[in-house]
Regions:
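Internal maturation/activation junctions in enzymes
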Residues: 15, 48, 57-58, 69-111
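A short core secondary-structure module
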Residues: 115, 119-172
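Short Gly/Pro-enriched turn/cap motifs at secondary-structure boundaries
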Residues: 96-99, 129-131, 151-152, 183-190
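Active-site-adjacent bridging/hinge elements
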Residues: 7-18, 37, 115-118, 202-215
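FAD-binding core of FAD-dependent oxidoreductases
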Residues: 28-30, 47-62, 82-93, 97, ...
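Amphipathic, small/basic residue-rich leader segments at the start of a protein or domain
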Residues: 1-56, 72, 76, 80
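Extended amphipathic alpha-helical segments enriched in small hydrophobics
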Residues: 222-239
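A glycine-rich, basic-preceded beta-loop-alpha segment at the flavin cofactor/substrate interface
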Residues: 124, 166-183, 190-221, 238-239
Length: 239
C-alpha cells in the first residue's frame, strides 16, 4: 500500500485530466504543448517527489505505445495510459544487467494466439506495484525465444513486450512484486523487484527491435529527471 492519501490524490489528479495535457486529443488527451507538462511536473516534484514518481513515466509509455504498438494493443491500452487511468512501468534492469542491457536474460515465448509468455526478473522498477490505479502496464525488455530460433546476442536481440498487471477480462496476470528495494530516500515511491512467471504479454514493435521502442520511453524519462531536479532545487532555494 502507498502512503495514506496517495491513492485519493492520484485518482483526483487523473480524473481532472492532468496526465493527458500533451497527449493527442484522438487518444483522450488535450493536445497542449509539452512545455506545460514540464512545468506541471516541476511543481509536483517540488511538492512531493515520491508521489510524483508514479505518473512520471506515463507520457513516455504513451509515446512508446502510440508509435510502436499494434492497433489491437493501442485500442486496449493507449487511452488508458494517455489519461492516466492506468499507470505504467519501464522494466529494463536485471540483477546482472544494469548499464549493459545486452546481458538481459528475461525471455518471451510466442504462443499460438499471438501473445507471449514472459519469464524473468527485473530490479529497480519504479512503481512496479501499488494501489494508485486498478491496473499497471509493464513495458518489459526481454528476448523473444521462438521455437528453433535463438534471438541475436547482445542488445540487437532484445524485444519489447507489454505485460499488464490485470489481463483483459479481469484476471490477475502472473507478475508479482517480490520485494521493495532498500533506498536511502524517496521512500514514498515503491521501487520493486518484479518477477514474471509465465506472465501473458504482447510484442510491441518488431522482434529484436525492442531498444528502438524503449528509447522513446527512456528519453522521455530523462527529460522527467530534469524536471524533478529543477523542482527539488527550486523548493530547496525557496526554503
Amino acid at each position: 500500500h502507498t502512503p495514506e492519501g496517495f491513492r485519493d490524490a492520484y485518482q483526483a489528479f487523473w480524473q481532472a485530466g492532468w496526465p493527458s495535457l500533451s497527449c493527442a486529443p484522438d487518444d483522450g488527451g488535450q493536445g497542449l504543448p509539452a512545455v506545460l507538462e514540464c512545468v506541471l511536473y516541476e511543481w509536483l516534484a517540488g511538492a512531493n517527489h515520491g508521489w510524483t514518481m508514479a505518473p512520471g513515466l506515463l507520457h513516455g509509455a504513451y509515446e512508446c505505445i502510440k508509435h510502436h504498438a499494434s492497433d489491437a494493443l493501442k485500442a486496449q491500452y493507449l487511452e488508458k495510459v494517455a489519461t492516466g487511468e492506468w499507470l505504467a512501468t519501464m522494466c529494463l534492469t536485471e540483477a546482472h544487467a544494469g548499464s549493459d542491457l545486452g546481458l538481459v536474460r528475461t525471455r518471451g515465448v510466442p504462443q499460438p494466439d499471438g501473445s507471449v509468455r514472459v519469464n524473468g526478473s527485473k530490479i529497480f522498477i519504479s512503481g512496479g506495484e501499488h494501489d494508485l490505479t486498478d491496473n499497471i502496464v509493464h513495458l518489459v525488455l526481454a528476448r523473444l525465444q521462438e521455437p528453433g530460433k535463438e534471438a541475436p546476442s547482445g542488445p540487437k536481440g532484445l524485444s519489447l513486450f507489454l505485460v499488464p498487471k490485470i489481463l483483459p477480462g479481469g484476471k490477475r496476470n502472473a507478475v508479482v512484486c517480490e520485494r521493495i528495494e532498500e533506498k536511502m530516500g524517496l521512500h514514498g515511491s515503491p521501487t520493486c523487484v518484479m518477477r514474471f512467471d509465465d506472465a501473458t504479454g504482447w510484442l510491441v514493435g518488431e522482434p529484436n527491435k525492442g531498444l528502438n521502442a524503449m528509447f522513446v520511453m527512456m528519453n522521455a524519462a530523462r527529460l522527467g529527471v530534469g524536471n524533478q531536479s529543477l523542482g527539488l532545487t527550486e523548493v530547496a532555494y525557496q526554503n
